[in-house]
Amino acid sequence: CQMAEKSLMQAVEHAKNAAGTSTKIIGSIAPLEDCYKPELFPGRDAAISEFAYLGGEMVEAEVDILILETMNSMAETEAGLCALKNTDLTLWVSFVLKDENHLLSGDRLDDTLNMLNNFQIEMVLLNCNPLGRTKNAVDNIVDNWSDGWGIYPNLGIGEPSADGCITEYESMEKYLSVVEYALSGG
């Protein structure tokens, strides 16, 4: 763990040096086991303990914002937020989706967004989703979330591969049309 802690401290230090004072540094915590396998969630108690540890490391590293990134289930998102709510860091959450209405776990996106109202979340994002799914989900975000939101979709065609290799890409025109749709508020 000491090597990981040292690497985190150095990474944040390098980011701050490169960014200067006007850019916020975001610390990211992904699902504890696998972004694309919600069934591997270790359970609430184990998750709260691990998220609290990771959040403490991010606080010590002095990141400005903490994002629970590529969250795939409501239970893991809630456990993470319970563990992080007292960090005094700005909190963001991003979700990977099964379709425009459901997280990868099958949990309803609107129910999950409603759960977020129990916490102080500055930003909700959709990430690691194909362009079409992202575009279709924008309306769900607009209808069910009144605070800040955004998207950063995958450019790869189809579902993410286990090895992370993207072999086919969407056109820049299609990407820009999804961005324009999101900017127009759905």
Q: What are the language-model segments listed below?
A:
Residues C1-G186:
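Domain-level signal for soluble alpha/beta catalytic cores
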